[in-house]
Amino acid sequence: RFTSAFSPVAFSLGLLLVMATAFPTPGPVGGESQADATSNRPPLTSPDKMEEFIKYILGKISALRKEMCDKYNKCEDSKEALAENNLRLPKLAEKDGCFQSGFNQETCLTRITTGLLEFQIHLKYIQANYEGNKEDANSVYISTKLLVQMLMKKVKSQDEVTTPDPTTDTSLQAILKAQDKWLKHTTIHLILRSLEDFLQFSLRAVRIM
């Protein structure tokens, strides 16, 4: 595990180097030091090991949710349903072709990729505002971006993948920044819970691809 001497920026750079190892890039990339071999790095993956990578991200989300529950009493609460609706977080539905009944690999891959791109806006908010384990928060954000890269390698019609409008990103960030502390904690909890659900359904879909 990283020690306190490692800043979130250093952690992010280390994780990006792991990403470079998993997916070679056009230019030369420096190697990692032996000290960076920790549980905070994702497994070295290729696109055919997407299942293990999704499990890795789910493990980080679980750790963050446990911390939110222990520190801020942000556990399951049905009263937060209204706030969740206001966030308009991505969900997988029957029409997305990801369920066993009516499964369609291309439609499903496209929807999962689009959904994770939509989550990036919310994960950026967590990365900036999470007051607990910054390493895990950074890991979820960066690893989800890497998962999108992995999925894009499998999508045949990449032009069907919808990228969020930059103006939506800007306006949502402005709204989220204006929240008080209680609502910030609630928002982070809801984003993590929704991403966990989304990835659980995605994991089941990947297993039957």
Curated annotation (Swiss-Prot):
One of its GO terms (molecular function) is growth factor activity. Disulfide bonds join C69-C75, C98-C108. SMART domains: IL6. Belongs to the IL-6 superfamily. Keywords: Acute phase, Cytokine, Disulfide bond, Growth factor, Phosphoprotein, Secreted, Signal. The modification Phosphoserine is found at S78. Gene3D superfamilies: 1.20.1250.10. Its main location: secreted. Residues 28-47 are annotated as: Disordered. Component of a hexamer of two molecules each of IL6, IL6R and IL6ST; first binds to IL6R to associate with the signaling subunit IL6ST. Interacts with IL6R (via the N-terminal ectodomain); this interaction may be affected by IL6R-binding with SORL1, hence decreasing IL6 cis signaling. Interacts with SORL1 (via the N-terminal ectodomain); this interaction leads to IL6 internalization and lysosomal degradation. May form a trimeric complex with the soluble SORL1 ectodomain and soluble IL6R receptor; this interaction might stabilize circulating IL6, hence promoting IL6 trans signaling. The lineage of its organism: Eukaryota, Metazoa, Chordata, Craniata, Vertebrata. GO terms for biological process: acute-phase response; glucose homeostasis; hepatocyte proliferation; interleukin-6-mediated signaling pathway; liver regeneration; positive regulation of multicellular organismal process; positive regulation of receptor signaling pathway via JAK-STAT; positive regulation of receptor signaling pathway via STAT. It holds the Pfam family IL6. It is found in: Secreted. It comes from the Eukaryota. Cytokine with a wide variety of biological functions in immunity, tissue regeneration, and metabolism. Binds to IL6R, then the complex associates to the signaling subunit IL6ST/gp130 to trigger the intracellular IL6-signaling pathway. The interaction with the membrane-bound IL6R and IL6ST stimulates 'classic signaling', whereas the binding of IL6 and soluble IL6R to IL6ST stimulates 'trans-signaling'. Alternatively, 'cluster signaling' occurs when membrane-bound IL6:IL6R complexes on transmitter cells activate IL6ST receptors on neighboring receiver cells. IL6 is a potent inducer of the acute phase response. Rapid production of IL6 contributes to host defense during infection and tissue injury, but excessive IL6 synthesis is involved in disease pathology. In the innate immune response, is synthesized by myeloid cells, such as macrophages and dendritic cells, upon recognition of pathogens through toll-like receptors (TLRs) at the site of infection or tissue injury. In the adaptive immune response, is required for the differentiation of B cells into immunoglobulin-secreting cells. This is Interleukin-6. GO terms for cellular component: extracellular space; interleukin-6 receptor complex. Residues 1-26 form the signal peptide.
